[in-house]
């Protein structure tokens, strides 16, 4: 938990919903959190201020016209659906909870538009109860830091409940939302990260190791439409958006969502980097190599090439820091794998 402690000392900023929650009004926290889904921070802040000038409590929400409500929360993402859910929410709160927001996770989860993230945020921010709010930022960063190894935010929440000391439960969401939006985003800005974090971050260690491999073997990045007619070794960076069970050869295994680095080469008499990599890029190809089966579901995002004959040497460098898919793409050599994994 050393990385969390470092961030607590380094960051002095609140996420928007945390700011809204300062007056401990459960109604405002609940409504703002629902609005914040799939919505940028600055939009959530603007919409919440505009909305709470007209909507002070459940009765106001119950009495407002749905179309007017939708106009008030525009341009929040899915504003029409959110307006519909907020109207349903107001009715249920009035009829079942005397117009009050319930203070338990179980009751909050019964409300329309309320998932585990929202429910946990309400009980922690509005009622000061123990909960762990896991959104995409918390899920992504806890996986990158190898605190958990999970596929979904819900899985991350349950793992954190087992592993995370309770003193961090209430603060981890605000901490990692701010850090995730500004630095450790889906396209990480490692160059902007704190030196103390980089020294201990397992994700940064892998990113740096990959950069060192590129330098060591003189790789250069090329675009898909400018692959040269040259001999050489290549690395494909492939993105798999969702976890998938994939069969290659006689083997079937689950491939986690994230990034895969595949190492290949083109040194045959009639083979060069251009025709080899362009074959990988085709959708309508005969399934032959292991990589063909992964590319049926994954997308090539980056291509790196070198004119050096270093396929196995590169694989042996990757294996020092990266997880690998055993026996993938290496049937004609002694390498353990030519496919390596990086969490998203």
Curated annotation (Swiss-Prot):
Cofactor binding, per record? Binds 1 [4Fe-4S] cluster.
Listed binding positions for [4Fe-4S] cluster are 184, 190, 193, 201
Q: Which GO terms describe its biological process?
A: base-excision repair, AP site formation; nucleotide-excision repair
InterPro entries reported in the protein's UniProt record: DNA_glycosylase, DUF123, Endonuclease-III-like_CS2, GIY-YIG_endonuc, HhH-GPD_domain, HhH_base_excis_C, HhH_motif, Nth
Q: Where is the GIY-YIG domain?
A: 229-328
Leading EC class: lyase
Q: Which residues form the HhH domain?
A: 105-124
Query: Which cofactors are named for this entry?
Result: [4Fe-4S] cluster
Annotated keywords: 4Fe-4S, DNA damage, DNA repair, DNA-binding, Glycosidase, Hydrolase, Iron, Iron-sulfur, Lyase, Metal-binding
Q: Name one Pfam family in it.
A: HHH
Give the record's family classification: Belongs to the Nth/MutY family.
Q: What is this protein called?
A: Endonuclease III
UniProt lineage? Archaea, Methanobacteriati, Methanobacteriota, Methanomada group, Methanococci
